[in-house]
Design a protein with these regions (language model features):
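Short, solvent-exposed coil/turn segments at beta-strand boundaries
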Residues: 65-68, 113-114, 156, 187-189, ...
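A short, N-terminal "cap"/entry segment at the start of jelly-roll beta-barrel domains
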Residues: 16-51, 73-172, 204-221
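Alpha-helix C-terminal capping segments
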Residues: 7, 97-98, 183, 188
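Sec-dependent N-terminal signal peptides
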Residues: 3-13
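Low-complexity, intrinsically disordered Gly/Pro/Thr-rich segments
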Residues: 101-107, 189-201
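Short glycine/proline-enriched turns and hinge-like loops at secondary-structure junctions
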Residues: 53-56, 112, 175-177, 201
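Glycine- and acidic-residue-biased ligand/ion/polar-headgroup-sensing regions
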Residues: 56-78, 173-192
Length: 221
């Protein structure tokens, strides 16, 4: 990413707001519960979003449903990037990022020439065995005719799996059925659909399955 100093911000710096309220055309709440909050994020070519705030959760996962161009984030608050402009590089559909999360207040400018969509999952579970740096998983070409499960990353908090469901066949069952899961559909007419621990679908289909290994950081009521 490229970093540039943000020289001035004025009164807007202290007025972070709910993204679903101030940027509802771009941020779409799918669900939230004690384990996670999942959002669908969509931008058209060269669209912008006003200053908004993301909450302080320990970690977050980004699943890129489509290709996407560069984004420019102007950060007003947040550690350790207060006062910086960050340019996120272009991404490929199927790429995944598992990141350390922090409270952020920023505006957004999408620099791409084609629409883009990704899923943002803010994890509320205990952040066990955190990697030192963000985990970036590149897109992968998979054989749609053969059911398969690929373990892309695992630590004490999560397990990130790519799942291929062959035509007419149910998606492979989880080897850890007691772990709740967040499933994102990556192909077909339901591409971009996100579900909490859904029943097994039938192929042809590709999914990203995030299985949650640790308990919510805050006690469930």
């Amino acid at each position: 990413m490229r970093f540039l100093p943000l020289l001035a911000c004025g009164a807007i710096c202290v007025s972070g707001q709910d993204p679903y309220a101030v940027a509802g055309d771009h941020y779409h709440l799918i669900f939230e519960n004690p384990w996670a909050r999942a959002s669908r994020v969509t931008y058209g070519p060269h669209e912008t979003a006003p200053v908004h705030e993301h909450p302080p959760t320990p970690t977050a996962i980004y699943i890129y449903v489509t290709d996407g161009g560069e984004f420019r984030f102007k950060h007003m608050t947040g550690l350790p990037i207060a006062g910086l402009v960050i340019t996120r590089p272009a991404v490929k559909a199927g790429a995944i990022r598992f990141s350390h999360s922090a409270p952020e207040t920023h505006s957004v400018e999408y620099l791409g020439d084609a629409p883009t969509e990704y899923v943002r999952i803010e994890l509320r579970t205990r952040p066990l065995d955190l990697p030192i740096r963000d985990v970036r998983i590149p897109a992968r070409a998979l054989d749609p005719g053969k059911s398969a499960v690929l373990n892309e990353f695992e630590n004490g908090q999560i397990r990130i799996l790519r799942v291929v469901c062959a035509p007419g066949k149910k998606c492979p069952a989880s080897q850890n059925p007691d772990d709740p899961a967040i499933v994102t559909v990556m192909t077909g007419p339901q591409r971009g659909l996100v579900r909490w621990s859904p029943a097994r679908e039938k192929g042809p289909l590709e999914e990203v399955r995030v299985e949650l290994k640790s308990e919510p950081a805050e006690p469930r009521k």
